[in-house]
Design a protein with these regions (language model features):
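Conserved N-terminal phosphate-binding loop of PLP-dependent enzymes in the Aspartate aminotransferase
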Residues: 1-113
Length: 113
């Protein structure tokens, strides 16, 4: 059968979208943030453009290209290809999770000064 007409492809994309949703929801919940979007176009509202910018810059330095969106660029947005390999998607989300944790730790440190 043709690649694009296969149910297996559609099922794979749906499954990957669910995996992405689950990981982002867990990351967001850890910091009291909310997720946005659907399917493979999802993000986390981190509360400010300044914070989102710091997170995306840190991700970029770690090899993950990720961008911001939203009225105030407050959403860190994952735009993974539909055909991304699960291991690669997980590795990217690991980087995102770490960089959000680090950014929040920096925020707490600044607040405590």
């Amino acid at each position: 059968g043709h690649f694009w007409s296969s149910d297996a492809f559609a099922d794979d994309v749906r499954r990957r979208g669910a995996l992405l949703e689950e990981r982002l929801a867990r990351i967001a919940a850890e910091h009291g943030f909310e997720t946005r979007g659907r399917g493979m176009m999802r993000g986390i509202n981190v509360g400010s453009g300044e914070r989102a910018g710091a997170i995306t810059a840190a991700c970029f330095d770690a090899g993950l290209i990720i961008e911001t969106s939203g009225a105030h660029d407050e959403i860190v947005k994952v735009l993974a290809p539909l055909v991304i390999d699960d291991a690669l998607l997980s590795a990217g989300l690991d980087i995102l999770e770490t960089k959000i944790r680090e950014a929040m730790a920096d925020d707490y440190a600044v607040a405590a000064e």
